[in-house]
Amino acid sequence: MNRPRIYSLIVGLVFVALIAVAGVNLISTKNKGVLGAHDEGDLPLAQFAVPDARSGASGDANIAQDDCDASQIPCPSGDTRTPACKVSVPGAIRVCDLFDKPLVLSFWFTRGGDCEDQEDVFEQAYRRYFPRVNFLAIDVRDSDSEVRKLIAERHWTHPVGLDRDGALSNLYRVGGCPTFVYAYPGGVLQHTSIGRLDQQRFFANVDALLTATKQRDETLR
């Protein structure tokens, strides 16, 4: 499936600050809004590759796009970085490899109050819906050892990637912890949700994604 070349969900690289406001865990970016604050459906997701938390792989997230001319991410002069979806590094998770099915992303961090409990809900959804739906959790700026400890203690089996410097969360304009991103096959945004969801509501969102995917497929035929 050909994906649009205009990556409207992305902004330049800046560091993110983690703050708590009115009980909601927020990630501040320099962008004018956060993902999910406006009607942004049907936009293509930006490409990325992240170290698998279980693999011991080192390095930051690769957010280089495959088309510098069309991408809204600035490509520095002389940049030779391999596009994210073309990396072949052991221990890397490429989001493009998950575009074959509906996809749910979760952005979270350990300083985010009940974010760890929300990852438990994410795990329950993974066990219920995979392999009909792909899932990937992205931890923002925690230590590798801390994330691996949580994975073991909480018996998570879903994939977990590492956003060590916060560049990926800024790329996606993540505005709160947790932020869930729901996408159609092909990596096209359906919708997002920010903040705590109980299991029933989260499962309802995944069911809605599956229903919308079926309807979209029928429309595109």
What are these regions (language model features)?
Residues M1-R81, Q215, T219-R221:
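N-terminal targeting signals for export/organelle localization
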Residues L43-L45, P90, L98-D100, F130, ...:
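Extracytoplasmic
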Residues A53-R54, S88-V89, P185:
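Short, ordered coil/turn segments that flank beta-strands lining enzyme active or ligand-binding pockets
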Residues Q65-S88, I93-F99, E116:
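Sequence contexts marking disulfide-bonded cysteines in secreted/extracellular proteins
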Residues F99, F107-Q124:
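Conserved redox-active cysteine motifs that mediate thiol-disulfide chemistry
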Residues D100, K149-T157, R164-D217:
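Thiol/disulfide oxidoreductase modules built on the thioredoxin-like
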Residues V104-L105, F135, F180:
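Hydrophobic beta-strand anchors of alpha/beta hydrolase catalytic cores
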Residues D117-R164:
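Conserved segment of the thioredoxin-like fold in thiol-based oxidoreductases
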